[in-house]
């Protein structure tokens, strides 16, 4: 069929465009599109001529002029389709307005005021239609019954119906309104439900009026009977889901629930045909039988039971209850009638086969029951029933014959289609993929099926197609290497099949030729080759001769004895030729397999290379842990609230490190790559971070350094000291160099002393602008405060220390030491002691030096007169000598913060007892002895630490011991090594005996009191110097024995985003190297290496290939091939190792150069230098928060177990966020605070009296501090707030100071005369001389 009707030549695109237009037009009616395709296939196969195609297309596209005219383009000349104007088409309905619908409902309500049943029934019908429980046909039918005597309402109701063919098929105006309504329902029921005039057993409404309509339908049916038969036989298709045999011309769904579909169908077909089809005849017969069962049930049951029966059927039709449940419910009603129950079960079987049957019966039964219940209409007479029964039987008999004939004609048409085009959706289902073929479907008989095949092979269950032509199954994408292997396999298979076929044919031809030569076969009768050679043998012979195969087969069949020898020679010739070709191709195929096998197995490397760079980016790694943290944030907040907002440890990421030896390989890789990428100076810094920080986190033993490495370290540290930028991460990072670096700093303390004196005399504005100088001043005053507390507590034993609570936190959180380690150009370092972040100033001592805790407490030191102000606001008198001594001490400890000495003992002792601690009296030992004991107590810990650090060799141990001797000779010993190494008696004889200004104040004795001229009582004067002896650490963060043991086996580090990415990259590198090591030693890897000529260690070969890639000896392609050969299919993650290592080293360089990262390293080494019993995780965390107030903080912990476990947690600051660190304080407010508010004026002067020396010695021989606090319990918990603007002081609620003195028992008077005389003398002395 050539498109001659068009001026220009048609192309394939024109045909595709037309098909797309047809498909779009009938997207909701897929059957029409499929039928159009079937018409085109029939024309292509010459089953239908051009005229037949035109006829079918006109029928299919009726109502769509654009499609019909567009089809003319593809018709030859002389076959154009001409359209005639269609007469009698009803005009389009006017759109119904909402106000009209409201008016119509109100009219119904007004009309039936006296009968609310009609109005409620009308609303129920509409609601059921809205819920898709009723079709539009059922709605019209029931409304017509309700408005039986109100024709005007029924006519008006038809205007609200969808624009379907039902409304278009209403008869002329001459017919009465009642006849029009009944005719409409009659015609619609032919499509969806049985005709209402066949409602046997129920009342027939106005049968006389229906007779003209039936007659008209009957005449029309006779006129179109032949045409329908022809079309039904030709166009029959089994795609209808509701009935097996449906008229092709109607193309309507059996239920027709959707008004839109009915409207669309009416537009396509013009109008619903008024005649019934032959399929309806069989349906009517079945319908009458099923309805008779319902009538029988109605006769047996009363009204209520029958209503219950209909309700059960309704529930079953809506699939609310199952069939067994329905049988159980109905059995309770009609179970006493066995024959009726059996008929009902058969009725259910028929309902399952025809889904529209039950709904139609329910509609008829409900309508009839409704009318009969009202009693308005009389029952039909028995004579009318008999007449209707005879007429019905005659009509059904004719229809049965017609249906049988139609089925026979359709069987030859529809079952000729392939199974893939059948609609098996209603057939029995075995699995989601298999359906049972219909019983009347002709099954092809397999010719070569054996007995076993008949038992096991399937002929009735077919696999249904899933999807459509728009959705094809997506196979796995093959790479180019697989394509090469597949091509080889195809060629090899083809050649194998040829060889096997030739060998088999040769064998059978030889056997047949032998039989002929030995006269085993009778030569009188012709020999049938098919009896001795199989179909495959004959096909091989035919293929052997190519185009002349058919001629050879004819010769073979005519003269077997002459043709067989020639054919056998040809077969053997081809057999040798193909065998030789096979051996040659085996070598080619083997080479192709060797080159492409491992590459063909690699399906992931291509995508892995594209995504790996994104996954290794800092943004992706941060997003990963943030996503995990956000999921846990809600639960963690609830836990934190329940625990008093304490620190919650719940790792977000956890990793195992099973192979400890792998750290050595990582070290060698990093060192080798750094030599290729970094300069000498960068190499030293990067490797120092690696060895002293990264490896120590994972518990890798320290690496010994050679002489060259030590010289490099000393040079680099000297350069750092000269430039004034000392880093704790570099000075304390390596345990071996800790003492030597400290000595190099101590040697420069005298030269730096003057610089720090000048820093102490600068103005406030200079301090505000210079953070480094401020840090030095704070470090100096912190050390003075430390020495002051050491002297105050000189008479107490370590096991009976006095505990004073310096702070009462509202949320029971831990006390902390916030260390602001500011490594700036000035090389300063700050250590500030503070508690829980709070907005309150807290008095922590009583007496002349009232210490106030501020929420940030990191402000600079100010000078007011001759007093130096610490950040917490304490004024301390400092002499010039003491100032020099203190300055030199700060210089010695600059950049080297080691809290192992008395500083930690006195300020971080943990007390898990009650709030009140009893101050026990010390023995007769003086403060000097206590101080000496403490110095001896502090030395072993330092020696042990130094011995552990220098245990690598005798040379380092000798050097450290020599350094310690130099320290003692120079008299420059800090609290790190000795809390009071010098004798306190020597301090009284020398001007420079005090190591801090606090020491000078607290060594005052009776002679100092006389020189100062103070006349206070002894006890009052002692109380002026009572200070908190130790910082109180709540039991919430106190380490128990179990925690201490776990702390020894773990390393905790708090870092920022940079360190988190560092450890993640380390983990990824470790994981990939471990994968290479594990997979190379797997059984598959051993099998690969055993096949090689020189089997070696697979892992060593891999490392060699990796080093060759890093130094440029080999390229990436060579490295990938080596990895595939050594490791196998899991090697794809190793293809980007060079990029990962380079990224890792660049990140290490960033960490080394970043100032904040160095501060975090310095803080880590500072916390690590504590003794285990004085380490608190919360303290370390709070110190980190001071450094990173607005940044993410990560808790990185490595448990040195087997295997080692690394856990990473993104900490959530929550409500306890530290305030911004203060940098200055108003001088006016500071002067008021210390000169007025904190100043103490003695109430009365102490009278000068004469004391006997023996009495004076008796009182003064004991420690003055213990004398004033004898049997006293003290708790300092009172807190106050001072507004800097108004200087207003307010006390914090629920805080208090307590001082409790336990009463002594009164001594009973001794009856001994001597004791009585002694007491009398003592009383006389007190009355007259005291």
Curated annotation (Swiss-Prot):
Where along the chain is composition biased (Low complexity)?
723-734
Intracellular or extracellular location(s):
Nucleus
Ordered alphabetically, the record's keywords are:
Nucleus, Phosphoprotein, Repeat, Repressor, Transcription, Transcription regulation
Which molecular-function annotations from GO does this UniProt entry contain? transcription corepressor activity
Its GO biological process annotations read:
negative regulation of DNA-templated transcription; response to abscisic acid
Q: Which domain of life is it from?
A: Eukaryota
Polar residues bias located where?
262-277, 920-932
Query: Which Pfam families does the record match to this protein?
Result: PAH, Sin3_corepress, Sin3a_C
Alphabetical GO CC annotations of the entry are:
nucleus
Kindly list the positions at which Phosphoserine occurs in this protein.
Answer: 996
Query: Acidic residues compositional bias: what residue ranges?
Result: 980-989
- Provide the residue span(s) of the region labelled Disordered: 191-281, 373-401, 718-775, 789-808, 882-906, 920-1002
UniProt xrefs under PANTHER family: SIN3A, ISOFORM G, SIN3B-RELATED
* Record note on quaternary structure: Interacts with ERF7 and the histone deacetylase HDA19.
Tell me more from the record. Answer: Loss-of-function mutant (antisense inhibition) leads to abscisic acid hypersensitivity in germination.
Q: What protein name is recorded for this chain?
A: Paired amphipathic helix protein Sin3-like 3
- Its gene? SNL3
